[in-house]
């Protein structure tokens, strides 16, 4: 089934400008409270100017351009400006340091970088010490260093005409983006995303939350992440809705932003829900227009119920990863929801549970979650310049091995158990980190929790818990272990406890477990 009809991203924006014109398309709020608004017509013009800027700097179809930016209008301009001329965006996690950023530059073959003064010193060092193909840097800030090969993004953009100067032939199968995975367990891999992928993501994600053109979709997720791009931005734009992009998440400011922009859809991860719950209760907690809160793993039922009750919202669960582009398993609009299920397979997808020999398992049995899609259309095309890694996870007929464990019930509802790499082998028993974390997270003194397996000469692995306490709380080892013994099987009780001020996380809020082992 082809729901795109040969329309690439250039055609999408030209059509959106014609159809929605002066309707608000994009609102960006900076951490300093500066708000920029663009209509669909104005945004398309800014995208065209940005495309022309890249063309004047020698960027042509197939060239790679890296973006190292926090959430800002320039990210949106560059994303679609590059797509309009057939160039390829390479977003870099804005929290990465020199070595990691240099590695992505080298492995993506990016020849131009758009960044801000905040990150520029790091790239000066990269240019001096690392072998990359980078030949020019555009800075989004007004003040510029007196360096060769550096120019002002804003000044160059504002000099460009609002109509597109370079429009090479485009196909929906053309690559629009190479998005490097967060790499919590190994080196990041470049996920190749096509024009078709992004167009499909927009329609699919709009369907998933029944998005309309009078909706306002607010997100604080980072723009360099697949959730922001494909679950939020592409959905909002494809439906002609208003997309609100907040620069950075603040638990204190979040509900005020939801109310100020009259948001009807937003998205949350567990870290956000937990930090929102520790904010002082307010009479305004339920004063909002949210219809759906898109939610991504993992949360205990007690935490979910408390959040929904306090704020008067419901969670729409969505399960996916960079390689699936969208939440390929999730709750459906208008359908029943069955917590803690992650939902059912969405349209255009098949899903099943397989054993270690790649054989389908019956309902109720735990195995690997596998998804069938169409590479380059409904799932990623490949890993960039890495056919071995591609072949490891993607079968020739479109079956994708997620590396996650779960099971399915008789009605087709799927249940997530854990990442395979997060299963602890303890004395012959398999222990799910997520299961333990959900239990421990219900302790009233604990704000955040992660458990990992550490080497044990007798039991294969021992379990260690890292916890962050709520402000002003203290927790003794005796109290912690007693709580665990009362709430889980004996073989699941952690052997060690470490209390920390925070936990290492990547840009999408996922805990980087390898930093704790």
Swiss-Prot record:
GO terms for MF: carnitine-CoA ligase activity; crotonobetaine-CoA ligase activity; medium-chain fatty acid-CoA ligase activity
Pathway(s) where this gene product acts: Amine and polyamine metabolism; carnitine metabolism
EC number: 6.2.1.48
Pfam assignment, any one: AMP-binding_C
Family matches, as InterPro entries: AMP-bd_C (IPR025110), AMP-bd_C_sf (IPR045851), AMP-binding_CS (IPR020845), AMP-dep_synth/lig_dom (IPR000873), ANL_N_sf (IPR042099), CaiC (IPR023456)
Keyword Ligase included in the entry's annotation: yes
Single GO biological process annotation from the record: fatty acid metabolic process
Catalytic activity: 4-(trimethylamino)butanoate + ATP + CoA = 4-(trimethylamino)butanoyl-CoA + AMP + diphosphate; crotonobetaine + ATP + CoA = crotonobetainyl-CoA + AMP + diphosphate; (R)-carnitine + ATP + CoA = (R)-carnitinyl-CoA + AMP + diphosphate
Record keyword Ligase present: yes
Keywords, alphabetical: Ligase
Summary of the function given for this chain in its UniProt record: Catalyzes the transfer of CoA to carnitine, generating the initial carnitinyl-CoA needed for the CaiB reaction cycle. Also has activity toward crotonobetaine and gamma-butyrobetaine.
Family: Belongs to the ATP-dependent AMP-binding enzyme family.
Protein name: Crotonobetaine/carnitine--CoA ligase
Encoding gene (name): caiC
């Amino acid at each position: 089934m082809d729901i795109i009809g040969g329309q690439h991203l250039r055609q999408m924006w030209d059509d959106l400008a014609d159809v929605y014109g002066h309707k608000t398309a994009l609102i960006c709020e900076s951490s300093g409270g500066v708000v920029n608004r663009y209509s669909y017509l104005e945004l398309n013009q800014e995208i065209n100017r940005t495309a022309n800027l890249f063309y004047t700097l020698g960027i042509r179809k197939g060239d790679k351009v890296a973006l190292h930016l926090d959430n800002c209008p320039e990210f949106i301009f560059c994303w679609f400006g590059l797509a309009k001329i057939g160039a390829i965006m390479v977003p870099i996690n804005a929290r990465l340091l020199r070595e990691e950023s240099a590695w992505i530059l080298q492995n993506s073959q990016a020849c131009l970088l758009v960044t801000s003064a905040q990150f520029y010193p790091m790239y000066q060092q990269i240019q001096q010490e690392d072998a990359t193909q980078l030949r020019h840097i555009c800075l989004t800030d007004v003040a510029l260093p007196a360096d060769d090969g550096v120019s002002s993004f804003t000044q160059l953009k504002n000099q460009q005409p609002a109509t597109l100067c370079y429009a090479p032939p485009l196909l929906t199968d053309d690559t629009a983006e190479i998005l490097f995975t967060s790499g919590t367990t190994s080196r990041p891999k470049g996920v190749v995303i096509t024009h078709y992928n992004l167009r499909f993501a927009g329609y699919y994600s709009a369907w998933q939350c029944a998005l309309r053109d009078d909706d306002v979709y607010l997100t604080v997720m980072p723009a360099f992440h697949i959730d922001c791009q494909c679950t939020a931005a592409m959905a909002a734009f494809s439906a002609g809705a208003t997309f609100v992009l907040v620069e950075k998440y603040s638990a204190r400011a979040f509900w005020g932003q939801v109310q100020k922009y009259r948001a009807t859809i937003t998205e949350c991860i567990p870290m956000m829900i937990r930090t929102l719950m520790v904010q002082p209760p307010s009479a305004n907690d339920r004063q909002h227009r949210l219809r759906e809160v898109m939610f991504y793993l993992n949360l205990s039922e007690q935490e979910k119920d408390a959040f929904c009750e306090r704020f008067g919202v419901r969670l729409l669960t969505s399960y996916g990863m960079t390689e699936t582009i969208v939440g390929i398993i999730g709750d459906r609009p208008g359908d029943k929801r069955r917590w803690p299920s992650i939902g059912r397979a969405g349209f255009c997808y098949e899903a099943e549970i397989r054993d270690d020999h790649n054989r389908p398992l019956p309902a109720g049995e735990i195995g690997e979650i596998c998804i069938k899609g169409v590479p380059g259309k409904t799932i990623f095309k490949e890993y960039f310049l890495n056919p071995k890694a591609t072949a490891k996870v993607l079968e020739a007929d479109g079956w994708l091995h997620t590396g996650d464990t779960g099971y399915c019930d008789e009605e087709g509802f799927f249940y997530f158990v854990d990442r395979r790499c997060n299963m602890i082998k303890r004395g012959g028993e398999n222990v799910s980190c997520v299961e333990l974390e959900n239990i421990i997270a219900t302790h009233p003194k604990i704000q955040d929790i992660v458990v990992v397996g550490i080497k044990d000469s007798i039991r294969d692995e021992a379990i260690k818990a890292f916890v962050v306490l709520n402000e002003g709380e203290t927790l003794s080892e005796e109290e912690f272990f007693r709580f665990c013994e009362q709430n889980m099987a004996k073989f699941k009780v952690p052997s060690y406890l470490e209390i920390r001020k925070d936990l290492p996380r990547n840009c999408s809020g996922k805990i980087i477990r390898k930093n704790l082992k």
